[in-house]
Every structure is written in C-alpha cells, then in structure tokens.
C-alpha cells in the first residue's frame, strides 16, 4: 500500500511523538499517555516491593498502554509521511535558477541575469525553450508548451499563452517549446509551489471547527469516564467491606478500565483522518488553503458550475456566418474577423480562422488603418475595433441591441429569428454590427460532455442542487441546461449577478461552491463557501479562492465535494464505531470485574470471560489492536456512495454502529480464550 521508506519513517516518528509537548495536543491520547506512565511507575514500585500491585500484570498493562500510544502516533505519522513524500518531490522542482530580467519589454536582447529568488513582483522575465520558469507569473507575450508534471503529475505538456484563461504559469515548471514573456506575480517564499509544499507537509494545517467540536465532545466523555473510574477505588473498597467478600479494585485496573472506556479509537485516528483527507485532495491535484474548506465541501448543497469546460467541452468554435438580408456572408465574415483580430480567446481565434478558410481573408496593416481594438469586458459583453471612421462590434444579442438602439440605429427582427434559431440548437450567437448596422450572426457551436447528465443525477440523489452559470442568452442556456440535466441556470451572467446569486442562497442557509478563473470571478469566489480557482487563472482569482485546481478542470468541483463528504463520513463513521466500542467494552468488562464483590453480576458475564484479570487484559489488547486495524480505513476513507443523506446515515449506523457493538464482544472473547490457552492468565 505504501513505500517501505514511509513505513520506516513513520516508525521513527512514532517514537519521537512520545514527547509530552506533542502528546498534550491530543487530550484523549494524553490520558492514555499519563496512564502508561502511572502503570510503568507502579510496576517499578511493585518490583522493588514498595507497592502491592502485581508486577507481571502491571508490566503487561503498562506495555499495552505504551503500544496504544505508539499505534496512535503511527497512524498520524503515516498520514504525515504521505504528505512529506509528496512535498519532497515538489522540493525538487523548487530550485534557484538564473532568470533573464528584461529592462525593456520591446527589446528581448537587453536582459539582466538575476537569481530567481531575487525576483520581485512586477519584474518582467524572458523564458526560452528547455528553461525553467523562475517564478509564478502571468504571460504577457507569447505562447508555448509547458511541462507542468513536476507539480500536477500530468506528463502531457500544456499550452500557456497571453490573454484568455491560460495565461498563468507556475515557478518550477519547464518550457518545452517556443518562448514566453512573463510578469512575476509572487516572490520567493510566497510562490504557489512554496504554499503547496507547506500545505502537504502539514506545516500550516490547523484543526477545523468540526474537528475542534468533536475533540471537545471526546474530552468531555473522557472527563466523565475519568470521574467514574476515580470513584471506583473508594466504592469497591467500601462495597467489599460491606459484602465481606472480594477486594477493592487495584489502581492498575482503574487505569486500564479508564483507557478501555475512553474514546481512544477515534481519539487516536482523528488527526490522521484530517491529514489523509487533505492528502486525498492533493492527490486529486487540488491545493486546499485550509481544512475548513475541505469540510465545507462536504456540507455543500448548491453547486454553481460554469457552462464552458464543465458542462460543455469548452472549445466553442465558429461554425457558420449567418448574415441578415442585404448582407453577403463574406461581408459579415470580413467584419467578424476584424472585430476578432485582437481577441485572444479560443472563440475569437476560431472566428479569424473560419473567415480565412471560407473566404481567404488575410491579415491587414492595422498601423496604416489607425486601428484601435476594443477588448471584451463583462460589463459591455462586446469587443471590436475602431478604424478610419468605422466602428465594428460583436457580442451578445441583447448587448448589441442596446448598443445599436443607444446610438440611434435599428435592430432588425430578422436578427432575432437567427439568434433564436442558433440558441434553440444549443449554440452561442454573437451579433456583428458595423457603423451601427447589424450585419448578422456568428454561430459558435458548443457540445455537452458525455456523462455529465448522469453525474448531475447522482448529485441530485445526494441532495445537491446544480446551477449552470453562463454568459449565453436565456434560450441557449435553457437548451443546454435541459440537455445536461442541471436543476437551474443563470443566463447572461455578470460578476454582480453571480455574487448576488451566491448571497441569495447563503441567506437561505445553503453552502455554495463554485469555480472561477478570471479576475471578474474574484468577488464571487471570495463570497462562496467553497471557491475553486483554476491554476491557469489570474492571480486575483487564485487569491480569492480557498482551493486551487492544478489541472484547471472545472469538473473537478464535483470530485472535491465527494472528497469533502468522504472526509466527514469517515470521521462520523469511526466516531460512531468508537463510541459503540466503548459501550460494548463497558458491558463486557464491568460484570466480570465486580462479581467477586457482587456474585449476582456473574449472570451478566454472557461471554464467560475467565477472570477479571483476563477480561481487563483482553479488553486493553483489543483497544490497542483495533487502532492498527482501522489505520488503512482512516487513510483511505469510508467508501462514498451517491444516495440521500438519510439512507447514507442509516447504512453507516448499521455498519459502524452495530459493527462497533458486536466486534468488541467477539474480539475480547477470542483474546480471552487465547490468553487462557497460552497460560498467561
């Protein structure tokens, strides 16, 4: 399951974690730790005749308690070891390299060689093929293939280019081809790689609110059992005198009984469950900024999903030019290409390519034309070009209609019919207007991904509502939403509309998750309970999110929710198992322990345990061994199934609740029989 090196390191760390400074961080296991020290002290006192405690029996109890503490340490060390192994591979990617810092962005020969660790935010660097990108940054010029395998594990190179949503590059990755001009967005020690190493090593892991709440419950239970166990010594002493039979319970037995009754199973595994949950997220190539974000993912009941890349394939391409009456297709194609020349999105480039392929329309001298490009914004929802007293705009139908009307023009009804036809087919219509005259529509074709409908059905079974977010018009959005099977959609989405939608659901008590990659997504990402920023996205988006997806796959949000739910389920299942164990051990041990004083209790010794000594030893051995048995489950997590929360709870209560009640009875009896056969008791 794991490399030998991790096992070996975990064994060493288990011993190092016996330090009181580390043990005090886990109050439940601190109780076992103190009990082991007391039992060891009683053994030595008995060995030298200072105490009446049985030396051999006390030594056995002391050793088992020490092993219980070591097993708990081992569980945590294994989980941490996995993180360290991942961090070590990341550290190999983080090394100081020489960077070419440009003095002037227009002159790529005028460079200063500088160590990557000395780079500052805003510096411009020039990176060539086969060179390592020195620091996190944003591509401002060029396009190149980048090998990101050191960080993502994905061997296939990816394209990084200026403009659009693939402009972010990460320090430590390598250029495979071409060149890039990069603006540095982070300094040494604060880079994405540095943050990732800190997270996977657990250096910045803090206990989550749910962990703290559960630990308070476990400590409360431990204090109650401590109080109960402490009263047994005077109670049994008084009872034995009154009954004239039996003897007072020994201090060793009080310690052993306390450890058996305290919720040590979940206390030992709680930390490893949290660390393993974060590790599973890291293995999915997602970096969580805090454990709180993972827990929130488990409680999410509303998902906001971008249409492009999540529900559809994301590579919308221009497939047709649909002119209005009185306009030729070539005339529309020419205007569409001009409006898209400076558009660095995949859609914009596809328009340029389609115009070239259909009508052999080539580039022109824009300096001579005195052209001024108008970039797309989320507010105007249009882009275009101004040249030689000509104005061309392309954009969403309603945005273009408002633009034409505001400038005194007429928006033809025929265009509405074309837009409706394209939208009804699930495509995206872009209307082109020149000098306030509508020329026609560009048909951008989009394809719904295979299997998404089934995934959304699974989410619905889990009680999660899915909402598609798109900038498309309502007709296009409705067609794609129906085909994909989402519960609702937000069409013609603006940053403000997304933000308000999140706030509306949060006011109703829902937890909301979303993905984003652009600067315009930052406000909504900052507001969402679970905000997954794409690694290729802008720096603003990454800073606003509480998770970063290294693969930049919007569909990863569904997997993140599943991992979050699995973490909460694992913690809940093992807590249920631990508490059920305590109840079973109570009813297994107490009758045997006291039937010397109260013979009537022998009738409750249903398992027929040999003696009080055997009962205590069997229970405390089981208490230690069950921790080791459950370590793989705490690391791997309880298997998650897509079903309603009520059914899932009933299923887990049956498996881990009932299982937790039955397992101790069977195991303790088997251990008791083994101890008797071996002649130990």
Curated annotation (Swiss-Prot):
Q: Which keywords belong to this entry?
A: ATP-binding, Cell membrane, Ion transport, Magnesium, Membrane, Metal-binding, Nucleotide-binding, Phosphoprotein, Potassium, Potassium transport, Translocase, Transmembrane, Transmembrane helix, Transport
Q: Which reaction does it catalyse?
A: K(+)(out) + ATP + H2O = K(+)(in) + ADP + phosphate + H(+)
| Protein residues bound to ATP | 343, 347, 376-383, 394
One Gene Ontology cellular component annotation held by this UniProt entry: plasma membrane
Which PROSITE patterns does the entry link to? Answer: ATPASE_E1_E2 (PS00154)
Q: Where are the transmembrane segments?
A: 30-50, 59-79, 216-236, 255-275, 587-607, 615-635, 661-681
One Pfam short name: Hydrolase
User: What coarse category fits the chief subcellular location reported for this protein?
Assistant: membrane
- Could you tell me where this protein is found in the cell? Cell membrane
Keyword Transmembrane helix attached: yes
Q: From the UniProt annotation, give the residues forming the signal peptide.
A: none
The entry lists its GO molecular-function terms as: ATP binding; ATP hydrolysis activity; magnesium ion binding; P-type potassium transmembrane transporter activity
Q: Its domain of life?
A: Bacteria
The residues responsible for catalysis, as annotated, are 306
EC number(s) on record? 7.2.2.6
Key word Transmembrane present: yes
Q: Which residues bind Mg(2+)?
A: 517, 521
**Which NCBIfam families does this chain map to?**
ATPase_P-type, kdpB
Among HAMAP family, the record links this protein to: KdpB
Indicate the family of this protein.
Belongs to the cation transport ATPase (P-type) (TC 3.A.3) family. Type IA subfamily.
Q: What job does this protein perform?
A: Part of the high-affinity ATP-driven potassium transport (or Kdp) system, which catalyzes the hydrolysis of ATP coupled with the electrogenic transport of potassium into the cytoplasm. This subunit is responsible for energy coupling to the transport system and for the release of the potassium ions to the cytoplasm.
User: What assembly does the database describe for this protein?
Assistant: The system is composed of three essential subunits: KdpA, KdpB and KdpC.
> PANTHER family attached here?
POTASSIUM-TRANSPORTING ATPASE ATP-BINDING SUBUNIT
What's the protein here called? Potassium-transporting ATPase ATP-binding subunit
Q: Which gene encodes it?
A: kdpB
């Amino acid at each position: 399951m794991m490399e030998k090196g991790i096992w070996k390191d975990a064994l060493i760390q288990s011993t190092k974690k016996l330090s009181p400074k580390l043990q005090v961080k886990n109050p439940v296991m601190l109780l076992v730790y103190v009990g082991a020290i007391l039992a060891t002290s009683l053994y030595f006192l008995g060995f030298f005749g200072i105490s009446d405690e049985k030396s051999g029996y006390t030594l056995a109890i002391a050793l088992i308690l020490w092993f219980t503490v070591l097993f708990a340490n081992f569980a945590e060390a294994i989980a941490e070891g996995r993180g360290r192994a991942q961090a070590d591979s990341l550290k190999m990617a983080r090394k100081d390299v020489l960077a070419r810092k440009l003095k002037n962005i227009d002159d790529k020969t005028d460079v200063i060689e500088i160590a990557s660790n000395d780079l500052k935010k805003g510096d411009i660097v020039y990176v060539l093929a086969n060179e390592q990108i020195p620091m996190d940054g944003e591509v401002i010029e060029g396009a190149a293939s980048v090998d990101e395998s050191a960080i993502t594990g994905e061997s296939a190179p990816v394209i990084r280019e200026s403009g659009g949503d693939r402009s972010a590059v990460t320090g430590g990755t390598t250029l495979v081809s071409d060149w890039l001009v990069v603006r540095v967005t982070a300094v040494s020690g604060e880079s994405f790689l540095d943050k990732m190493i800190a997270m996977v090593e657990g250096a910045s892991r803090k206990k989550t609110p749910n962990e703290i709440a559960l630990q308070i419950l476990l400590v409360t239970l431990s204090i109650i059992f401590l109080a109960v166990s402490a009263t047994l010594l005077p109670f049994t002493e008084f009872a034995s005198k009154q009954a004239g039979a039996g003897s007072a319970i020994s201090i060793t037995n009080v310690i052993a009984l306390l450890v058996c009754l305290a919720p040590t199973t979940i206390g030992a595994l709680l930390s490893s469950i949290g660390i393993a949950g974060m590790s599973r997220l890291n293995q999915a190539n997602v970096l969580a900024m805090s454990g709180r974000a993972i827990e929130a993912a488990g409680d999410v009941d509303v998902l906001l999903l971008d249409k492009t890349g999540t529900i559809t394939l994301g590579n919308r391409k221009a497939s047709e030019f649909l002119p209005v009456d009185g306009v030729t297709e070539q005339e529309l194609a020419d205007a569409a290409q001009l409006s898209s020349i400076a558009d660095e999105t995949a859609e914009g480039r596809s328009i340029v390519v389609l115009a070239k392929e259909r009508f052999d329309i080539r580039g022109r001298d824009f300096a001579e034309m005195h052209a001024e490009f108008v970039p797309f914004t989320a507010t105007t929802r249009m882009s275009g070009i101004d040249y030689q007293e000509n104005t061309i705009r392309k954009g969403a139908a309603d945005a273009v209609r408002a633009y034409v009307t505001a400038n005194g023009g007429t928006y033809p009804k025929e265009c509405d019919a074309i837009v409706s036809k394209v939208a009804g087919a699930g495509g995206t219509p872009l209307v082109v207007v020149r000098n306030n005259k509508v020329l026609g529509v560009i048909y951008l074709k989009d394809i719904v991904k295979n299997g998404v409908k089934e995934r959304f059905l699974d989410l619905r079974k889990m009680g999660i509502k899915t909402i598609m977010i798109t900038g498309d018009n309502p007709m296009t959005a409705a067609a794609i939403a129906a085909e994909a099977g989402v519960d609702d959609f937000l069409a013609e989405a603006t940053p403000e509309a997304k933000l308000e939608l999140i706030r509306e659901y949060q006011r109703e008590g829902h937890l909301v998750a979303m993905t984003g990659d652009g600067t315009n997504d930052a406000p909504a990402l900052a507001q969402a309970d679970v905000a997954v920023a794409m690694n290729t996205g802008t720096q603003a988006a990454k800073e606003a999110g509480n998770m970063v997806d290294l693969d930049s796959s919007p569909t990863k949000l569904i997997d993140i929710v599943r991992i979050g739910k699995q973490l909460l389920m694992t913690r809940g299942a093992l807590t249920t198992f631990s508490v059920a164990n305590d109840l079973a051990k109570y009813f297994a041990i107490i009758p045997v322990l006291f039937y010397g004083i109260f013979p009537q209790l022998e009738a409750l010794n249903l398992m027929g345990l040999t003696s009080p000594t055997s009962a205590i030893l069997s229970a405390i051995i089981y208490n230690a061994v069950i921790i080791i048995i459950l370590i793989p489950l705490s690391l791997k997590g309880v298997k998650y199934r897509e079903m309603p929360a009520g059914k899932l709870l009933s299923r887990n209560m049956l498996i881990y609740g009932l299982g937790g009640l039955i397992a101790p009875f069977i195991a303790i009896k088997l251990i008791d029989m083994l101890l008797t056969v071996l002649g130990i008791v």
